[in-house]
A protein has these predicted regions:
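Active-site metal-binding motif and surrounding structural segment of the metallo-beta-lactamase
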Residues: 46-107, 207
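Active-site neighborhood of phospho(di)ester-bond hydrolases with catalytic His/Asp-centered motifs
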Residues: 51-55, 74-87, 107-109, 179-184, ...
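Core dinuclear metal-dependent hydrolase active-site scaffold
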Residues: 1-67, 135-196, 202, 285-289
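Active-site regions of enzymes building and remodeling cell-envelope glycoconjugates
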Residues: 132-134, 152, 275-280
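Short glycine-/acidic-enriched loop or helix-start segments at secondary-structure transitions
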Residues: 15, 61-63, 89-91, 117-118, ...
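Cap/insert and terminal regions of metallo-dependent hydrolase folds
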Residues: 177, 185-286
Length: 289
């Protein structure tokens, strides 16, 4: 089975609406630099199609997925890590106003399910049979659909919980496993006091990890109150990881804010991270699990 990375940007995409800084103006002048919000497309061994996250840029993500051989549309299932804008604002595209889908299994936490039930534009999709919520049990592997040939496991990860809780997801195939963790508040809260990042990934039996790389450092968003948008910076994460050593898992960063210099392949930051042996995730990358 295979996983396609359908987007690498933070919720607002790149370029971001309202940003007139050079970072986004460059992307407007050169559309090939643009990036879509984080999302995964998964093709099961039985040919079934599954998505993680439901972005409003789903049309472009479908085109990208189709270019590498997406199996079927609409997907058999969608899984949501949490409730924030860029991870859920495309749900309505499955409804009667656009695709007119039916019977899409929506995997999420019970906390996210409560929000679905209390949000009219989503609850009506449940009533109409467009989506069928299915609540996962944290840390318990499950098949998104019977016979798909892979499992998902939801890992609780602290992140702003004003709307719902937040989870990372482990996708486990016959050969390898991949951790998808676009959002977290801090490594201290995620790991606790005893584990390091590599120890944690080893305990989860993860071969590939796509992790929160929202900000390179907080200097890039000096006009914002960072307590309102907590994420560990990439520089902090690199300090905890050190240089990659033989036997370490494959770790790549995702969920880049539009200000993040890792969006520019020629930047010093991009070069520094690469020299340490870690990865900058590429939109359209395919992982065979």
């Amino acid at each position: 089975m295979e996983v396609t990375l359908l987007g690498v940007a933070q919720d607002g995409g790149f370029p971001q609406v309202g940003c007139l800084k050079e970072c986004c103006e460059d992307a407007r002048r050169s559309p090939e630099l643009s990036k879509m919000p984080v999302s995964l497309g998964i093709r099961g061994l039985d040919g079934s199609c599954h998505m993680i996250e439901a972005s409003r840029m789903m049309a472009g993500q479908f085109d990208l997925w189709n270019s590498v051989g997406a199996p079927e549309w609409p997907p058999s299932s969608v899984s949501l890590t949490h409730a924030h804008l860029g991870h859920t604002d495309g749900l309505g595209l499955f409804g009667r106003e656009v695709m007119g889908s039916s019977g899409i299994i929506l995997h999420c936490s019970s906390s996210m399910g409560d929000l679905l039930d209390s949000t009219p534009s989503w609850s009506i999709m449940i009533e109409q049979g467009v989506i069928i919520p299915n609540y996962w049990a944290p840390l318990e592997p499950f098949e998104p659909t019977p016979g798909c040939g892979f499992t998902l496991t939801a890992i609780p990860v602290p992140h702003r919980s004003e709307l719902s809780d937040n989870h990372a997801l482990i996708i486990r195939g016959d050969k390898k496993s991949l951790l998808f963790m676009p959002d977290q508040d801090s490594w201290g809260e995620t790991l606790g006091e005893e584990l390091g990042i590599l120890d944690w990934l080893d305990a989860l039996e993860v071969d590939i990890a796509l992790i929160d790389g929202t900000f390179w450092n907080y200097d890039e968003i000096s006009s914002r109150d960072v307590s309102e948008i907590p994420h560990p910076t990439v520089t902090e994460t690199l300090g905890l990881l050190g240089n990659r050593k033989q036997g370490d898992p494959e770790i790549s960063f995702i969920h880049f804010n539009h200000t993040n210099p890792l969006l520019r392949e020629g930047s010093n930051e991009y070069r520094h991270l690469s020299e340490m042996g870690w990865g900058i995730s590429k939109q359209g990358a395919v992982y065979h699990l």
